[in-house]
A protein has these predicted regions:
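Signature of Gram-negative outer-membrane beta-barrel scaffolds
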Residues: 1-97
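Flexible, surface-exposed loop regions and adjacent strand-edge segments
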Residues: 1-8, 52-64, 117-127, 174-184
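Extracellular loop and loop/strand-boundary signature of outer-membrane beta-barrel proteins
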Residues: 5-12, 25, 72-78, 127-133, ...
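Hydrophobic, lipid-facing positions within transmembrane beta-strands of outer-membrane proteins
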Residues: 18-24, 86-90, 131, 141-145, ...
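Tryptophan-centered motif/residue detector
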Residues: 41, 45, 127-131, 173
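Flexible coil/linker segments and helix-coil junctions enriched in charged and small residues
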Residues: 60-66, 189-191, 199
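Membrane-embedded beta-barrel scaffold of Gram-negative outer-membrane proteins
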Residues: 95, 101-113, 117, 134-197
């Protein structure tokens, strides 16, 4: 015979956030050979209720989840945490001749949504989470330098470019972190700095 099966429904509370921003930019020709582009974006991110916000103990023991120090309930539309960040960008172009140019640029980028990915487990798992009172937005400063060459009256372009990126508050997790249906996921997360470079 067939026995009645039992099922359990596990789910986590939804998280709510609102992101907004303004951006201004300008393009300026300095001379026949030099042109500039520059701008500024101001982004604002609000992590909001309804929901619970946790505060964790500051002490970090390698490989162990931080303990919950307190829990506070927030109502609908109440701001739990707010972040405001300037994101400047600047680029300069030097026209070597009609078909070749050199470009240099700087960008500050801020990311408020984080992908917590565990690809080493037997069942790969991706978890998306917004920036919260415990997870700061990730910031990246990138500089780049490139040489660009057009061919056949600008029908084709070839280029080589090098870049360096410095990353602040890069999110990672402790060894043995529980990413699946974990109400206290933030206690398993770490923030660090990183860098990337290439061509």
């Amino acid at each position: 015979g067939i026995s009645d099966g039992e099922t359990s429904d596990f789910s986590l509370d939804n998280k709510y956030a609102l992101e907004s921003g303004i951006y201004i930019a300008n393009q300026q020709t300095v001379s026949d050979k030099i042109s500039l582009q520059y701008g500024l974006r101001i982004s604002m991110f609000n992590y909001m209720g309804p929901g619970s916000a946790f505060e964790y103990f500051d002490d970090v023991t390698p490989g162990l989840r931080r303990g919950v120090a307190s829990e506070e309930e927030f109502g609908r539309w109440e701001t739990i945490q707010q972040y405001i960040n300037p994101e400047p960008r600047f680029s300069i172009k030097y026209q070597v001749n009609k078909s070749a140019s050199i470009k240099a640029s700087y960008n500050r980028m801020v990311q408020y949504i984080h992908l917590i990915s565990n690809t080493s487990a037997s069942n790969p798992l991706d978890v998306w989470t917004p920036s919260t009172n415990n997870i700061r937005p990730m910031k990246a400063d990138q500089i780049a330098l490139g040489y660009f060459k057009n061919f056949k009256e600008n029908a084709y372009e070839a280029s080589v470019e090098v870049y360096y990126k410095n990353i602040i508050d890069l999110v990672d997790y402790i060894d043995g972190a529980d990413l699946l249906i974990n109400r206290f996921l933030e206690g398993d997360l770490l923030a660090g700095d990183g860098r990337a470079y290439g061509a």
